[in-house]
């Protein structure tokens, strides 16, 4: 799929996964992003580098359809942000970030933290899940080396364990695009190396989503 986007003078040929054209974000007197043009093709793996305050998190929040730019055009998985129901689009994008992690109840079991992503919610309410949902959640936890923690309360986990649970949650909906916002932040050297190794395995999987 190739779609030519035009809006406010901006033009871009949108890839299957992600396309920014002339994207800027302004908050008060601060320009968080300035005229960003960027494309991510299917199967690509990207690493975004920059100092604190450079706009990395803002960029990923837009890519996850959780923020709109001040100016410019954003294409996500063949849809144009601002013309699509974001509640239908968001489940197609996996996001692991501090903004989501801080909303996870400490008293929720690890298994529930992951399986509730099926409904795009945080914390159990009155929804029900089938065996396939639980099997997928356990499979993801196992792939990330934390299946043995499924019955533990999220609030009792170490920072490294929480990071892996967050990634499992982000993968629960089988997303077409996976966004990881500073996945190794707060980890010691050993925890960072372990997480990077597991992400490396994910990145090498030809069936895995585009990864940023």
Name each model feature, range by range:
Residues 178-182:
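Catalytic Walker B motif of ABC-type/P-loop ATPase nucleotide-binding domains
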Residues 80-94, 130:
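ABC ATPase NBD coupling module
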Residues 174:
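Conserved catalytic motifs of ABC-family nucleotide-binding domains
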Residues 128, 153-157, 161:
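Conserved ABC ATPase signature
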Residues 64:
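Helix-to-loop junction immediately C-terminal to a conserved catalytic motif
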Residues 72-82:
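Conserved ABC transporter NBD signature motif
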Residues 167:
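Hydrophobic anchor residue at the start of the ABC signature
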